Amino acid sequence: MSQNDLIKTIRMNYLFDFYQALLTKKQRNYLELFYLQDYSLSEIANTFDVSRQAVYDNIRRTGDLVEDYEEKLGLYRNFEQRQNLYEQIKQHINDPEQIKKYIQALEDLD
């Protein structure tokens, strides 16, 4: 697995966590098996008795859909920003002025 594939898989796992409630059961099943359980297209196709192409198309369309949700709702983007601010707070724990700045930035995200 290349570095880009790994980054995409991690991103899709996060997007799946945030947006799975907005997906159909079939979409959830395919994405979960492919990205979280690391099933191959053939294994998913055999499990659901469909073609590999059908699985591929569904995963691609569903991936595009969760990316669209992220573009509109930004749940993952906000999560990443919060995580970065938490790390900054940890690094500046002995600097009250910096802490206030980061807390304000956290509040501004809401």
Swiss-Prot record:
In terms of Pfam families, this protein maps to: UPF0122 (PF04297)
Which superkingdom, per the lineage?
Answer: Bacteria
- Name the InterPro entries for this protein: RNA_pol_sigma_r3/r4-like (IPR013324), UPF0122 (IPR007394), UPF0122_fam_protein (IPR054831), WH-like_DNA-bd_sf (IPR036388)
Q: Which HAMAP family match?
A: UPF0122
Q: Which NCBIfam families match?
A: PRK00118.1-2 (NF001067), PRK00118.1-6 (NF001070), YlxM (NF045758)
Primary role: Might take part in the signal recognition particle (SRP) pathway. This is inferred from the conservation of its genetic proximity to ftsY/ffh. May be a regulatory protein.
Q: Which family does it belong to?
A: Belongs to the UPF0122 family.
Its name, as the record gives it, is UPF0122 protein SSP1533
